Amino acid sequence: MADYKVIPYSKEYLTGVRALWEEQYEAADVKRREVLFKWFTEGNPFLKDESPYFIVLDGDTVVGLWGHMPVTYSVKGKRYDGYMSQDALLSKRSRGKGIGKIVLREIKAQRDGFAGALWFNEPNFRLYSKCGWLEVPGLHPQVKIIKPLKYFKQKLNSKFLSIFFMIVFSGVNFATKI
């Protein structure tokens, strides 16, 4: 196994992060991700003098990143600071090697109050479960397609198919559990 290192993100690694995105996303998505990423890492007014991202290095190469936003919880009137994990990405060649467990262990060692995780896909859900994270009873993530015609146009790249799906799904509530 390679010697992976998990460190807080700094601007010097942006080129490596961009390469990681380019491996997995289309050019337009990379541009949008970079704008959002720069806001999270440079312009976010809620930053607490620490990076909201960790990067995973294999030598000098960025092979992963993990985002977490600072949050404040209130329990019975008492405030607690913590983080909400909201972005995780590993290079395709780095998956299935136990790196996710290394990352979660290192983040826990480097930050206090790492407390929640959002916006899971199935692999992330399995990883966090294996690492002892618990599902929150009664918390049911949902998604709703606000403008179905626009969504189908973007996804299908065909006005005809978009209209067809709109007719087929007319009357269907697009709020579905994930």
Label the model's feature ranges:
Residues Y73, L134-S158:
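Conserved catalytic-core motifs of GNAT/GCN5-like acyltransferases
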Residues L90, R95-A109:
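Conserved acetyl-CoA-binding loop-helix of GNAT-fold acetyltransferases
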Residues Q110-N121, W133-L134, L139:
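Conserved GNAT acetyl-CoA-binding A-motif
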Residues R126-Y128:
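Conserved active-site tyrosine of GNAT-family acetyltransferases
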